[in-house]
UniProtKB/Swiss-Prot annotation:
Glycosylation sites: N328
Main location: membrane
Function: Heterodimer with SLC3A2, that functions as an antiporter which operates as an efflux route by exporting cationic amino acids from inside the cells in exchange with neutral amino acids plus sodium ions and may participate in nitric oxide synthesis via the transport of L-arginine. Also mediates L-arginine transport in non-polarized cells, such as monocytes, and is essential for the correct function of these cells. The transport mechanism is electroneutral and operates with a stoichiometry of 1:1. In vitro, Na(+) and Li(+), but also H(+), are cotransported with the neutral amino acids.
Pfam families: AA_permease_2 (PF13520)
Protein name: Y+L amino acid transporter 1
List of residues that carry Phosphoserine: S21
A GO CC term attached to the entry: basolateral plasma membrane
Family to which the UniProt record says this protein belongs: Belongs to the amino acid-polyamine-organocation (APC) superfamily. L-type amino acid transporter (LAT) (TC 2.A.3.8) family.
Its membrane topology: Multi-pass membrane protein
Length: 512
């Protein structure tokens, strides 16, 4: 679907432009390349990771972890294990991101290691379930926390929440279409806000501990449930809060000096989030007992009601702001995934085009926004989350298997960051556990998730694998017309790919 002429090595482009300038009137320098610009700094990278990881989870998930662990002590151990597991995964992705300098995270890594088929299934699953569902859920959570205070004695109107969620998605899509720097600025501001809110919770907890409120920590492991099923479900709840550590790998091509800033951003972000999560839970436990936490739908709000007095409204606001920042990071990541998928020929060409003046992937952002808006129309949207746990962890694990495979297949490949094999092997073993658990404990939803992934098979073999000249003429005309009009409306052209390692992009069957 993507012609090989779309991608030219940057040096060749510059040479052609230089020749043109020499033959012209010498009025100015060669035209600037139309491609994604490297505008994400180290600070932006840290804020993207922290901002996406700290969503609504830490304000809500403590209930799920405590429900299955059944004790404060074991729940803190689960939170620590979840943090260590996420650090292992993030370190593996740091090596992959500095070795394979493409945006798209696991999609790009699976494509490089195993070819187009598995990569397309990964993309198809994200397209149908993972990305639009998660964005719709985050937007609805944001809207609920913003609207509910206006209706203290009753439930907020359904339409009001959905309209506000739609407005949130549209606003953030517009911001990211306008300028990359606008999107990173929004991310930075809202990351600072949510971290400050959690610091306020932590300080309040420390004050209570200083006043002698240590009753809940006496015999903290009493009543613990060590059943493997309960441990697994508690770990799932914790990992929900830690999800997002791979955010920066979706925008690798836009990071300044990725060999340095990608692993450094991960190395800074992961300890920050893990420490904040542990201290926040300690703060919760210093005020609330097990019964209070299990009876609460939003632990942080219950905590604020008992501690902050007339300022208890600050925590629902903090949850809303946290969701807003998390949604922004999710939109950035998902749009780049669609962009790279189109560039590799797995989605229509128009999606990998870039605005000629703003250098933002406007078509992929709009496509992602439309998908999220469509999923807002699903009344029981939260049910869809249950369908992708299996698929998500399967493809994350497959990426790390690809890392091990590339170590064996290409041992001499340059790797700016090279980990001990201990990290990917341990992570793969843990991922097998995370994939097996939902198959056993939530078989129906897991099978539905597998079915959704496999529904991409006809599309792949009947369209993607078929050479363009053999596709129906009517289909080619529709695609060509749509691409042309979208280029005009979005002021976008095909992106040039700047390959720093000098390798030509892979074309043909493997990338198809």
């Amino acid at each position: 679907m993507v012609a090989s002429t779309k991608y030219e090595v940057a040096a060749q482009n510059e040479a052609d432009e230089a020749d043109g300038s020499a033959q012209g009137d010498g009025a100015g320098p060669a035209a600037e390349q139309v491609k994604l610009k490297k505008e994400i700094s180290l600070l932006n990278g840290v804020c993207l990771i922290v901002g996406n990881m700290i969503g609504s989870g830490i304000f809500v998930s403590p209930k799920g972890v405590l429900m299955y662990s059944a004790s404060f002590g074991l729940s803190l151990v689960i939170w620590a294990v979840g943090g260590i597991f996420s650090v292992f995964g993030a370190l593996c992705y740091a090596e992959l991101g500095t070795t394979i300098k493409k945006s798209g995270a696991s999609y790009a890594y699976i494509l490089e290691a195993f070819g187009g088929f598995l990569a397309f299934i990964r993309l198809w699953t994200s397209l149908l379930i993972i990305e639009p569902t998660s964005q719709a859920v985050i937007a609805i959570t944001f809207a609920n926390y913003m609207v509910q205070p206006l209706f203290p004695s009753c439930g907020a109107p359904y339409a009001a929440g959905r309209l506000l969620a739609a407005a949130c998605i549209c606003l953030l899509t517009f911001i990211n279409c306008a300028y990359v720097k606008w999107g990173t600025l929004v991310q930075d501001i809202f990351t600072y806000a949510k971290v400050l809110a959690l610091i306020a919770v932590i300080i309040a907890g420390i004050v209570r501990l200083g006043q002698g409120a240590t009753t809940n920590f006496e015999d903290s492991f009493e009543g613990s449930s060590f059943a493997m099923g309960d441990i697994a479900l508690a770990l799932y709840s914790a990992l929900f809060s830690y999800s997002g550590w791979d955010t920066l790998n979706y925008v690798t091509e836009e990071i300044r000096n990725p060999e340095r800033n990608l692993p450094l951003s991960i190395g800074i972000s992961m300890p920050i989030v893990t420490i904040i999560y542990l201290l926040t839970n300690v703060a919760y436990y210093s005020v609330l007992d097990i019964k209070d936490i299990l009876a609460s739908d939003a632990v942080a709000v219950t905590f604020a009601d008992q501690i902050f007095g007339i300022f208890n409204w600050t925590i629902p606001l903090a949850v809303a702001l946290s969701c807003f920042g998390g949604l922004n990071a999710s939109i950035v990541a998902a749009s780049r995934l669609l962009f790279v998928g189109s560039r590799e020929g797995h989605l229509p060409d128009a999606i990998c085009m870039i605005h000629v003046e703003r250098f933002t992937p406007v078509p992929s952002l709009l496509f992602n926004g439309i998908l999220a808006l469509v999923y807002l129309c699903v009344e029981d949207i939260f049910q869809l989350i249950n369908y992708y746990s299996f698929s998500y962890w399967f493809f994350v694990g497959l990426s790390i298997v690809g890392q091990l495979y590339l170590r064996w297949k290409e041992p001499d490949r340059p790797r700016p960051l090279k980990l001990s094999l201990f990290f990917p092997i341990v992570f793969c073993l843990c991922t097998i556990f995370l994939v097996a658990v939902p198959l056993y404990s939530d078989t129906i939803n897991s099978l539905i998730g597998i079915g959704i992934a496999l529904s991409g098979l006809p599309f792949y073999f009947l369209i993607i694998r078929v050479p363009e000249h053999k596709r129906p003429l009517c289909l080619r005309r529709i695609v060509a017309s749509t691409t042309r009009y979208l280029q005009i409306i979005c002021m976008s052209v095909a992106a040039e790919m700047d390959l720093e390692d000098g390798e030509l992009p892979k074309q043909g069957p493997k990338s198809k």
